[in-house]
């Protein structure tokens, strides 16, 4: 969904410049990650849709992918470490995905995601290293440009890099 941009009086007064915020927390799954997930799922071939998708996630990418896969009736497995909070696990399950809890860190969970991709032919959808995910995240930048054509600077959070690559 198109999310609003709102003026932040507190931040603007703090730094002495006009600051506006893009409210991606108002997305259906609570974050921008749904943008990339929907785009990636939409670009799967019929054979990929039949085999299903798999991803590694600590929460938001998994929620977005689970939501998108459920919309298209595609099998979805999200691999997570055993240290991920239960509310994130349950949130992903509630959106129709299977969750596999593997190991004490994301590297160990990644091994299971890779195995499913190789052995079961599932399509691995990275939260940041996937051209369709990055293009989907880029819709956020396009919206900002339409909503604020006079914008001079954009500050984009950086974790895996998928959002900033798209924007």
Which residues make up each language-model segment?
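PLP-dependent amino-acid enzyme catalytic core
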Residues: 1-167
């Amino acid at each position: 969904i198109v999310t609003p941009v709102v003026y932040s009086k507190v931040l603007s007064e703090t730094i002495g410049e006009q600051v506006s915020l893009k409210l991606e927390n108002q997305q259906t799954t609570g974050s921008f990650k749904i943008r990339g997930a929907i785009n990636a799922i939409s670009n799967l071939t019929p054979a990929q849709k039949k085999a299903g998708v798999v991803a590694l996630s600590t929460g938001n990418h998994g929620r977005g992918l689970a939501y998108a896969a459920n919309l298209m009736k595609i099998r979805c497995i999200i691999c997570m470490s055993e240290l991920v909070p239960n509310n994130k696990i349950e949130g992903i399950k509630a959106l129709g995905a299977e969750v596999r809890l593997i190991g004490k860190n994301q590297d160990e969970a990644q091994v299971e995601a890779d195995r499913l991709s190789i052995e079961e032919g599932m399509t691995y959808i990275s939260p940041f290293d996937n051209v369709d995910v990055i293009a989907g995240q880029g819709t956020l930048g396009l919206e900002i440009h339409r909503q604020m054509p006079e914008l001079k600077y954009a500050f984009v959070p950086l974790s895996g890099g998928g959002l900033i690559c798209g924007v």
